[in-house]
């Protein structure tokens, strides 16, 4: 099977990823080898695998503290597996409804020797009541007004949403104004990161879930 060309590792990867770079190289090689065949990534995504996917996910790992994180719709492992590689002090639960992708996440976490990964082959809404997390993230899942009611039940009181968004995030926040209030979200804001590490800009929507009275 012919594989698409893979983006060379950018110089900024060393600065951003530090000691995790070796494991991320192994992960990138596996995505390049199996990604198209398993339907994890499209052929046009491999020529920006590092910049758009791996480094983009690595930026999130720099924004959170130790604790627990759930990645909703983890897919090929962006950002969940990348966070797990970079942050052994974060216990990562990868929630993925598609069986072949969940199997990939299980197999890849074992190949990489990650002891801080749990994979749930379920829809996010079906996991409600099983656990709550310090952080919940999602990437390229849906607009905030749809996504927030889905993921807030997974966040512990006082925990935080850290949702990876695109350039339309400000409009999404305006569209979701009533949803933010209804779901008890505090201090909603957009954090822009990336240029300080010499890589592309990434926008992260952050909001804290209110403590119970």
Predicted regions mapped to residue ranges:
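Conserved beta-strand/loop positions that form the S-adenosyl-L-methionine
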Residues: 72-74
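Conserved SAM-binding loop of SAM-dependent methyltransferases across substrates and taxa
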Residues: 76-89
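Conserved SAM/SAH-binding loop
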Residues: 121-126, 141-142
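Conserved beta-strand signature within the Rossmann-like core of class I S-adenosyl-L-methionine
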Residues: 158-171
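Class I SAM-dependent transferase core
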Residues: 1-70, 86, 100-117
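Active-site capping/gating segments
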Residues: 89, 93, 168-213
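A short acidic, Gly/Pro-enriched loop at the edge of an enzyme's catalytic core
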Residues: 125-135
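Helix-to-beta-strand junctions that scaffold the AdoMet/dcAdoMet cofactor pocket
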Residues: 87, 155-157
